[in-house]
Design a protein with these regions (language model features):
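Electropositive polyanion-binding surfaces
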Residues: 1-347
């Protein structure tokens, strides 16, 4: 047993993290399977997944096409509820865990691997039940209309972020024209969505979270901060768009819902942040709103790579995003309506 394994085991033990499955959960797993109920058949549409190279639970797939009016983006999300019955032992265990926990080289999943890495994972060339959010965008990247459907898809390819980034510079002739056209359309739509994000002054705080590499004995061999790629933003903006539509949908059809909210920062924390940047020589006198002030600080920090550690201080001044039945909007994203419809395998 190496040093890394020992360290993770210690963290699991000290925090009493549930990491084994009960007999009841294991018994239910034997009877699970993909149901063949009536669904929209979208298997011919070239959906693809785009994830990190080490990902095993593929819970979202995308397809995008451009037309004379703008863009049509379809986001397919694994339909976990089709497999996990309400109040079942698996459901109760997922509720207890709340989220998957990711350690280096180890994951403690919220759902058993048979579900998260197989039955609900959008593996290439496998039929999977999904919920699809189909969105029509204008040329400027504004959502014109949307609808949700219970569908079945068959992922045509599993991409990594680096592979999609490579495609932006080098067109892979081994890929079908449909897949290439979809990636190109999503790239163009993402540029519009990022432009809209900038116009509404959503916060753009780049993560300085390091990634660790480990040697054979479990010792740290390298520490580095991974580069954020445009391919990451393609998926992020696609998921944000789907989550906006999810919030609108539940509000329209149910009159209430569970929203992902982010409140404005507290006055005292903003004052402390102002003092810090004032000592750094930055003028802090002429801001009309907390949003303008924080964006100014972020812009200042991002001018120099050496300053980016200061992003941690900005993050600490913000409130934590949370779930609520009160729809008060998302300060960081500058959205009035926002929920979490995506990533049902891990949260």
């Amino acid at each position: 047993m190496d040093n890394l394994t020992n360290s993770i085991d210690q963290v699991v033990e000290e925090n009493s993290l549930p990491h084994e499955w009960s007999k009841e959960v294991l018994a239910e797993l034997k009877d699970l399977g993909v149901k063949n109920n009536k669904r929209d058949d979208l298997r011919k549409i070239p959906f693809v997944t785009i994830d990190g190279k080490d990902a095993k639970d593929f819970d979202d797939a995308v397809f995008c096409e451009a037309n004379k009016d703008g863009f049509v983006l379809q986001v397919a999300i694994a339909d976990v509820a089709e497999i996990v019955e309400p109040s079942s032992s698996i459901d109760k265990e997922a509720l207890s865990r709340g989220t998957s926990i990711y350690f280096p080289k180890r994951v403690i999943p919220m759902l058993p691997e048979e579900i998260s890495n197989n039955l609900c994972s959008l593996i290439p060339n496998e039929d999977r039940n999904v919920l699809v959010c189909k969105m029509n965008f204008t040329q400027e990247g504004e959502i014109n209309s949307y609808d949700f459907s219970e569908s079945i898809i068959n992922s045509h390819k599993r991409f990594t972020y680096n592979e999609v980034e490579f495609l932006k510079q080098n067109k892979d002739t081994n890929l079908s024209a449909d897949i290439l056209n979809s990636i190109n359309a999503l790239e163009k739509l993402t540029k519009q969505l990022l432009n809209n994000r900038s116009k509404r002054y959503a916060l753009e705080i780049e993560s300085s979270e390091p990634t660790l590499s480990f040697g054979n004995e479990g010792n740290i061999s390298e520490i580095f901060i991974p580069k954020r790629l445009f391919a990451h933003q393609m998926i992020e903006e696609a998921m944000i768009s789907a989550n906006i539509c999810a919030a609108k949908f539940i509000k329209k059809h149910l009159g209430f819902g569970v929203y992902r909210i982010h409140e404005e920062p507290e006055h005292l924390k903003l004052e402390n942040l102002k003092k810090f940047f004032s000592l750094k020589g930055l003028s802090t006198k002429s801001f009309s709103s907390p949003l303008e002030m924080i964006n100014s600080f972020i812009k200042h920090v991002n001018k120099d790579e050496k300053n980016k550690i200061t992003n941690v201080l900005i993050l600490q001044s913000l409130k934590r995003a949370c779930y609520s039945t009160k729809e008060i909007g998302h300060f960081g994203l500058q959205l009035k309506e926002y929920s979490h419809f995506t990533s049902p395998i891990r949260r």
